[in-house]
Amino acid sequence: MVNIRPDEISSIIRQQIEKYDQDVEVANIGTVLQVGDGIARVYGLDEVMAGELLEFEDKTIGVALNLESDNVGVVLMGDGRDILEGSSVKGTGRIAQIPVGDAFLGRVVDPLARPIDDKGEPASNGTRLIESMAPGIIGRQSVCEPMQTGITAIDSMIPIGRGQRELIIGDRQTGKTAVALDTIINQKGQDVVCVYVAIGQKASSVAQVVSSLQDKGALDYTIIVAANADSPATLQYIAPYTGAALAEYFMYKGKATLVIYDDLTKQAQAYRQMSLLLRRPPGREAYPGDVFYLHSRLLERAAKLNAELGGGSMTALPIIETQAGDVSAYIPTNVISITDGQIFLSGDLFNSGIRPAINVGISVSRVGSAAQIKAMKQVAGKLKLELAQFAELEAFSQFASDLDKATQNQLARGQRLREILKQAQNSPIPVEEQTAIIYTGINGYLDDIEVSKVAEFIRELREDLKNSKPEFGENVRSTKKLEPVSEELLKRAIEDVKQGFDKA
């Protein structure tokens, strides 16, 4: 019989115990109680954070939004068709964040910054939280540099500065996206990074935007974030925050950035859908009580940073769609009160052939005039006054049959001024040419030209300034003023064009 030596066995057991090294991984696990309509109710997950990312068995990602005593309300970032009742859910311990980097320029990504343009994964320089804090009061400085849109009516009367939030508001099909895209196209060569966020739009519309930016050579400095109409409500809700996070990466590197949210009405509707399905109490127009905070925390991230933080800026152009011109609805009034001004696009003006269809009377820029260049200030003040008087006279003259000569002259000048503000889509005008156009109009040089010929005259004047008198543009660009030398050149150009022009 073999002798069993207890000391040998005990030493073997001791060695086994000493070698035993099992890493214990503690996971926060819950169970799905109910799933449907892009919402899951989960039992367990005792240590979950608000806004934490959760992973389901089928690898779908969700966000914990409602933390209740007996369950957690989770919104899904996928269709959730393969999530079963009773399946497990794992807490990741992370708040939603996205990769960021210079390689994202020229790319089309989804709200989680995953590429959707079949060009491969962009190299990232790190990550940023989708929801990050807006810069504080001390970290900001007042708006002091212009953000030229290339649209004469806006740059002269409703100027936008870098770091401003300017709302573009109007009914559907009034040219809101066109104004935003023209602004992106006009940033070519200005060292501005643009981010276009498409929320709840048709994929065909987004494809159209991409191709028009590509044609104009503007895609190289633009990032497009697209949450299409068929995307889950959760992705439509986070898309604007993703756009802001991508822009913040460049802003904190000292760059000027421009973000367009097209449009925030769709984001509010997606958030309303999620809130109602989570059984949060509805408020006005069935929106949840925190829908103001939804937009204010997004738009407060736009800023002009002070020199210590690098002097970068984020300019926000949110778009809001109104119903039958009703700006007193809930979402429009909220966003108007958050932003630093609004550009109101009117359906009636659009249909009567005035494009861009900007209603100058109720459009306003609260801080942009501080950023306007001196040359534009010299001519724009008179333009706004003349147009306001013209609008008043035009309404009055519809009832009067015989008008005195002065009134007729004022009406004639007003019609010509309105004509010079018309502009084709995707053809932004440099600020020095805008100054020349307005100067020509307000100083009566167009009064003897037929209204139908004004556009042709302006086109010839721009050609003459560009080809025969390039020093005019150089002077205005370098001095930012309309100096007597430049004024003389402009007057000569007007005379030269008039000589060979058929006015009638």
Curated annotation (Swiss-Prot):
Per UniProt, what is the membrane topology? Peripheral membrane protein
Q: Which top class of enzyme applies to this chain?
A: translocase
Recorded catalytic activity of this chain's protein: ATP + H2O + 4 H(+)(in) = ADP + phosphate + 5 H(+)(out)
The record, for Pfam families, names: ATP-synt_ab (PF00006), ATP-synt_ab_C (PF00306), ATP-synt_ab_N (PF02874)
Site (described: Required for activity)? 363
Coarse class of the protein's main subcellular location: plastid
Question: GO MF annotations for this entry?
Answer: ADP binding; ATP binding; proton-transporting ATP synthase activity, rotational mechanism
Q: What is its EC number?
A: 7.1.2.2
Q: Where does ATP bind?
A: 170-177
- Identify the GO cellular component terms for this protein: chloroplast thylakoid membrane; proton-transporting ATP synthase complex
Entry similarity comment: Belongs to the ATPase alpha/beta chains family.
Quaternary structure and interacting proteins, as annotated: F-type ATPases have 2 components, CF(1) - the catalytic core - and CF(0) - the membrane proton channel. CF(1) has five subunits: alpha(3), beta(3), gamma(1), delta(1), epsilon(1). CF(0) has four main subunits: a, b, b' and c.
Provide the protein name: ATP synthase subunit alpha, chloroplastic
The species this protein belongs to is Pyropia yezoensis
